[in-house]
């Protein structure tokens, strides 16, 4: 994706997206206009220092030369090459360089209007590029294959493990998710799948039901006395669940191996014993083949995870039929969404509710989120962009603050005829902070963390011509959500669900306690 802006503070508005692209490995081309060199540091209006302004958050930054009226062929070729190099750098110029943003800063002198320039050479064959619509400079890269010695050592470690497990964090590759579910099946080992892993919602779920584990955020809170794993295979980014992170921290005796295509470090707890830089899907496929040649028997270890998973969802399903709360909103949305739909899940509480309350299901739902830096900037706009690259419908579930920060994203939907379903869980402020110890300290909590705003969003929807529904009960929400999905081909709908953060937290804690007590007896 390429984004363009004028000079000055407009360039700073791109920074949150650039940071997210940096940490999430998303290719992005940043094209900023700038004042000419003689006006920099001169007090000229709308002029700031834009040269390498994004620091290490971009893969490459170039202050492009001023345009010339009659450029030499060398200059033309350098610009054509620059475009190709920028595209390649954003997409990972080699397979060990993470994808991310590239910044090209273009200074211009007046006149800026599209007027004829004497002796302009835009019709020169040098501008035309290569024949057959090929890039001027084609840059290719291949996958990193693991060495034979690394795979032999991995096979040996895996073969001698008695209690192996797979962790798949946020991941955009459906191929990797499929390879790991196959490995978990033939290896009879639990696959703890993050809600953004692409492994929870798959058409293969029923045949993998006993291995794909999604209820861990609840039942691992009662697993302190469980036997620890002796091998943990870690794929993708760090998981969303704090309970799973705590479990990894407590697994002192486990040999932990992380896998990465580009060497990006995803271990804030500094626990991994080994990092293998290679194509993770190829490694998973090789391990599955190795296992199928020497099948593992089912074990008490894997059976306990499977039994805990089943019991957890029995308890959660029953709890969803009780008093309405915010976790039920996310669970019901996922259960109603059709096969092939896409979900963009907002940060803060929504992604955690998806993790804890939306059970795995036998349908392909691609889950997106901004988990690189986990900010709430540009939530509506990002979902709008994602919707243009996936099959309809796309559902956005966000909190009220995330929606409030990007309400003008609704204008993008209106202007470009983009139709999505937006669910806003409105707990009147930063409800996630209710989970933290600071919630016990008032007035600092209420004034500085909760930041109650007292707003509802029906008038916002009306201003932008978006259909609106308010849901105060589970029946109302399910009905409104089904109507919105059926109408997504013609217009967008905003569904607002008011909730009470204190009551929501009490419901969550009660459900977790029920799960903990139930799995203790397994």
What are these regions (language model features)?
Residues 32-86, 194-306, 437, 496:
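Glycine-rich, acidic loop regions that bind phosphate or pyrophosphate groups
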Residues 1, 87-98, 150-164, 183, ...:
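Glycine-rich phosphate/diphosphate-binding loops that line cofactor/substrate pockets in enzymes
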Residues 1-35, 227-236, 391-405, 420-425:
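A short, small-residue-rich loop immediately preceding and capping a beta-strand
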Residues 304-391:
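Active-site diphosphate/adenylate-binding microenvironment
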Residues 152, 167-257, 265, 362-392, ...:
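Glycine-rich, anion-gripping cofactor-binding loops and their flanking helix/strand elements
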Residues 31, 38-52, 353, 358-522:
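Thiamine diphosphate
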Residues 143-158, 177, 321-336:
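A short, well-structured juxtamembrane/interface segment
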Residues 52, 98-101, 105-144, 482-522:
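Glycine/aspartate-rich loop-and-adjacent alpha/beta segment that forms the canonical ThDP
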């Amino acid at each position: 994706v390429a984004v363009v802006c004028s000079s000055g503070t407009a360039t700073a508005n791109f920074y949150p997206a650039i940071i997210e692209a940096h940490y999430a490995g998303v290719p992005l081309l940043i094209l900023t206009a700038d004042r000419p060199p003689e006006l920099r540091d001169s007090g000229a209006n709308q002029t700031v220092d834009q040269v390498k302004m994004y620091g290490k958050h971009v893969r490459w930054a170039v202050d492009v030369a001023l345009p010339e009226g009659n450029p030499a062929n060398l200059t033309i070729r350098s610009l054509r090459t620059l475009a190709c190099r920028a595209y390649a750098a954003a997409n990972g110029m080699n397979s060990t360089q993470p994808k991310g943003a590239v910044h090209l800063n273009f200074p211009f002198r007046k006149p800026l209007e599209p007027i004829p320039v004497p002796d302009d050479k835009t019709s020169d064959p040098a501008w035309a590029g290569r024949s057959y619509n090929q890039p001027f400079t084609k840059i290719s890269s291949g996958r990193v294959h693991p060495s034979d010695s690394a795979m032999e050592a991995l096979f040996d470690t895996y073969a001698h493990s008695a209690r192996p497990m797979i962790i798949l964090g946020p991941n955009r590759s459906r191929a990797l998710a499929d390879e790991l579910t196959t490995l978990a099946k033939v290896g009879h080992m639990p696959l703890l799948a993050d809600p953004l892993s692409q492994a929870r919602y798959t058409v293969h779920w029923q045949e993998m039901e006993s291995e794909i584990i999604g209820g861990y955020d609840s039942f691992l809170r009662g697993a302190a006395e469980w036997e620890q794993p002796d091998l943990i295979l870690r794929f993708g980014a760090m998981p969303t669940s704090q309970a799973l992170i705590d479990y990894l921290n407590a697994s002192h005796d486990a040999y932990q191996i992380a896998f990465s295509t580009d060497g990006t470090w995803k271990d804030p707890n500094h626990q991994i014993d080994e990092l293998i830089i290679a194509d993770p899907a190829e490694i998973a496929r090789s391990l599955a083949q190795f296992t199928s040649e020497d099948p593992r028997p089912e074990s008490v270890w894997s059976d306990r995870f499977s039994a805990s998973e089943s019991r957890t969802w029995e308890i959660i399903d029953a709890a969803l039929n009780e008093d309405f709360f915010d976790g039920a909103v996310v669970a019901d949305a996922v259960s109603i969404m059709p096969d092939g739909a896409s979900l963009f899940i907002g940060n803060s509480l929504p992604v955690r509710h998806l993790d804890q309350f939306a059970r795995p299901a036998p349908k392909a739902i691609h889950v997106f989120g901004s988990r690189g830096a986990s900010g709430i900037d540009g939530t509506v706009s990002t979902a709008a962009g994602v919707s243009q690259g996936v099959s309809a419908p796309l559902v956005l579930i966000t909190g009220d603050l995330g929606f409030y920060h990007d309400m003008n994203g609704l204008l993008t939907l209106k202007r470009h005829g983009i139709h999505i379903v937006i669910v806003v869980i409105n707990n009147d402020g930063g409800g996630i902070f209710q989970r933290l110890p600071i919630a016990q300290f008032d007035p600092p909590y209420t004034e500085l963390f909760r930041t109650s705003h007292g707003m509802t969003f029906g008038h916002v929807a009306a201003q932008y011509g978006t259909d609106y529904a308010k849901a105060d009960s589970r029946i109302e929400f399910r009905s409104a959500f089904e109507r919105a999905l059926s109408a997504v081909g013609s217009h967008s709908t905003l569904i607002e669900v008011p909730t009470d953060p204190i009551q929501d937290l009490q419901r969550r804690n009660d459900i977790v306690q029920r799960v903990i007590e139930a799995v203790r007896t397994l």
